């Protein structure tokens, strides 16, 4: 049993893979909050050329929760995440079969407005990618693309979005300075502010803290707890401590297959599959 192995491997609350205390101390979701399905994935298969990368993935991602995707490098985590807003469409020789539905709508239907889909499903990448513009213009960028020109509206949305991203107090007196002058952690929170400014339903975070120092990582994690009150969040992480700390649900992937998907506490303490147990206890990966 995993619990037995944890006792053997524990050193100051740590296992090879993650901190078991994180499960005890993690803020819990508010009771009574809806847990209906936001994203439904059915028999999803994906090829890059002749290379089959995703192999019949089936899952339902609950609304208003944080779902973490873990697994060794190359297992298909990020590829799956990019399917949720069709970023893989930009890759040559990519072919997809199966279905992904948001609120019952198949996002791979040919009638889907892809720019609108990417507004509804925002994405933040591993490396912060602010535009070489002012802090203000970074946040206002998506609104301007939508045709918003009213300065009062822009001001309100910029302030609200920066507050949501826990960045307002740090930048409110320098909004017209170049965003590239911010620290790495501030840049990543700015990118999150830019994403939430257009009022998405889902936020996809692909290793959002892997390039940041521990303090900046903590701020990103605290921000995720706050944002899940308004958005459904899916995060890819190689850091199992982070998955245990921040997520409500965890999906373990291996070689393009979804091996196990369960609430985080259960998956990390009593996994149903031996592959999952081996991975979270450091036997491979």
Swiss-Prot record:
Compartment(s) of residence: Cell inner membrane
**Boundaries of every ABC transporter domain copy:** 39-280
Membrane topology type, per the record?
Peripheral membrane protein
| Reactions this protein catalyses | phosphate(out) + ATP + H2O = ADP + 2 phosphate(in) + H(+)
SMART domains, per database record: AAA
The record's listing under InterPro entries reads: AAA+_ATPase (IPR003593), ABC_transporter-like_ATP-bd (IPR003439), ABC_transporter-like_CS (IPR017871), P-loop_NTPase (IPR027417), PstB-like (IPR005670)
Against SUPFAM superfamilies, the record matches this protein to: P-loop containing nucleoside triphosphate hydrolases
Q: Which residues bind ATP?
A: 71-78
MF terms in GO: ATP binding; ATP hydrolysis activity; ATPase-coupled phosphate ion transmembrane transporter activity
Q: Tell me, what's a Pfam family for it?
A: ABC_tran
Instruction: Identify the EC number(s).
Output: 7.3.2.1
Q: Name one GO biological process term.
A: phosphate ion transmembrane transport
Q: Provide the alphabetized UniProt keywords.
A: ATP-binding, Cell inner membrane, Cell membrane, Membrane, Nucleotide-binding, Phosphate transport, Translocase, Transport
Going by the entry's taxonomy, the superkingdom of the source organism is recorded as Bacteria
Cellular component GO terms, alphabetical: plasma membrane
The record's listing under PANTHER family reads: ABC TRANSPORTER I FAMILY MEMBER 17, IRON EXPORT ATP-BINDING PROTEIN FETA-RELATED
How is this protein organized at the quaternary level? Answer: The complex is composed of two ATP-binding proteins (PstB), two transmembrane proteins (PstC and PstA) and a solute-binding protein (PstS).
Q: What does the function comment of this entry state?
A: Part of the ABC transporter complex PstSACB involved in phosphate import. Responsible for energy coupling to the transport system.
* Protein family membership: Belongs to the ABC transporter superfamily. Phosphate importer (TC 3.A.1.7) family.
Could you identify this protein by its name? Answer: Phosphate import ATP-binding protein PstB
Q: Which organism is it from?
A: Alkalilimnicola ehrlichii (strain ATCC BAA-1101 / DSM 17681 / MLHE-1)
């Amino acid at each position: 049993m995993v619990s037995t192995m944890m006792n053997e491997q524990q050193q100051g609350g740590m296992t090879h893979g993650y901190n078991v205390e994180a499960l005890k101390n993690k803020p819990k979701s508010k009771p009574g909050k809806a847990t209906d399905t936001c994203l439904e994935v059915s028999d999803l298969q994906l090829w890059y050329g002749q290379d089959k990368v995703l192999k019949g993935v089936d899952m339902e991602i609950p609304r208003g929760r944080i779902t973490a995707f873990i697994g060794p490098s190359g297992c298909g985590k990020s590829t799956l995440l990019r399917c949720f807003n069709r970023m893989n469409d930009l890759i040559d020789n990519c072919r997809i079969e199966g279905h992904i539905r948001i609120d019952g709508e198949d996002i791979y239907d040919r009638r889907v407005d892809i720019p609108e889909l990417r507004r509804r499903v925002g994405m933040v990448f591993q490396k912060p990618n602010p535009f070489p513009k002012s802090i203000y213009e970074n946040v206002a960028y998506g609104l301007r693309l939508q045709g918003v020109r009213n300065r009062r509206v822009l001001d309100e949305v910029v302030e609200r979005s920066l507050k949501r991203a826990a960045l307002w107090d740090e930048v409110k007196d320098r909004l017209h300075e170049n965003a590239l002058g911010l620290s790495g952690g501030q840049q990543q929170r700015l990118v999150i502010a830019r994403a939430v400014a257009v009022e998405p339903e889902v936020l996809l975070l692909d290793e959002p803290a892997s390039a940041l120092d521990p303090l900046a990582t903590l701020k990103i994690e605290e921000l995720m707890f706050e944002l899940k009150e308004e958005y459904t969040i899916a995060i890819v992480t190689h850091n199992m401590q982070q998955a245990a700390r921040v997520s409500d649900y965890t999906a373990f992937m291996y070689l393009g297959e979804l091996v196990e998907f369960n609430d985080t506490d259960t998956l990390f303490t009593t996994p149903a599959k031996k592959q999952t147990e081996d991975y979270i206890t450091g036997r491979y990966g």
